[in-house]
Amino acid sequence: MLPPPPRQPPPQARAARGAVRLQRPFLRSPLGVLRLLQLLAGAAFWITIATSKYQGPVHFALFVSVLFWLLTLGLYFLTLLGKHELVPVLGSRWLMVNVAHDVLAAALYGAATGIMSDQMQRHSYCNLKDYPLPCAYHAFLAAAVCGGVCHGLYLLSALYGCGRRCQGKQEVA
């Protein structure tokens, strides 16, 4: 024999207390767009270096590009999902963390761009039309351009964050 049907419907499940919500204003903000461009240019930078034959100081440029690509990816998703307040000690100062990250990234990308420009000049001998051996000149040229773009993008986002801070705002977007 079947039990009688319930008189009341079962209670609705509550949304999880720490539910993840997409922060749509961040996607449309200048910093959100800059972060996406930084991720694209940074990926182009380190993929260009990684696919060429490199040695010596180029290892530093590759380290800088991969490190800041991963850090930028983390900052982007923590801000996009609104979970930056869960980061111990730094979550309450999220705008300043972003500015410090951008200033450091701009400085180190500037150094990496200088390294790639130097390597490009050192390999300029093989930039001849009929040079028969493989040459990393074009890869280093592309990496130097991508590094300069990354440097500029991080500098822009640092200036944007400083401007927001000077206006008295505490939030990234």
Swiss-Prot record:
Q: Where is this protein found?
A: Cell membrane; Cytoplasm, Cytoskeleton; Nucleus
Q: Which UniProt keywords apply?
A: Acetylation, Cell cycle, Cell membrane, Cytoplasm, Cytoskeleton, Membrane, Nucleus, Transmembrane, Transmembrane helix
Q: Which residues form the MARVEL domain?
A: 26-166
GO terms for cellular component: cytoplasm; cytoskeleton; membrane; nucleus; plasma membrane
- Please tell me where this protein is predominantly located: membrane
Enumerate the Cytoplasmic topological stretches. 1-29, 81-94, 160-173
Q: Name one Pfam family in it.
A: MARVEL
Q: How does it sit in the membrane?
A: Multi-pass membrane protein
* Xref: InterPro entries: Marvel, MARVEL-CKLF_proteins
Q: Does this UniProt record's set of keywords contain Acetylation?
A: yes
- Molecular function (Gene Ontology), one example: structural constituent of myelin sheath
Give GO BP annotations, semicolon-separated.
Answer: myelination
Membrane-crossing residue ranges in chain numbering? 30-50, 60-80, 95-115, 139-159
Where N-acetylmethionine occurs, residue numbers?
A: 1
Residues assigned to the Extracellular compartment are: 51-59, 116-138
Q: In which tissues is it expressed?
A: Widely expressed in normal tissues. Down-regulated in multiple primary tumors.
What's in the misc comment field? Answer: Down-regulated in primary multiple tumors derived from ovary, vulva, uterus, cervix, breast, testis, kidney bladder and liver. The reduced expression is owing to DNA methylation and could be reversed by pharmacologic demethylation.
Query: What is the role of the protein in this entry?
Result: Microtubule-associated protein that exhibits cell cycle-dependent localization and can inhibit cell proliferation and migration.
Please identify the protein, giving its name as recorded: MARVEL domain-containing protein 1
Organism whose genome encodes this protein:
Homo sapiens (Human)
Per the record, the gene is MARVELD1
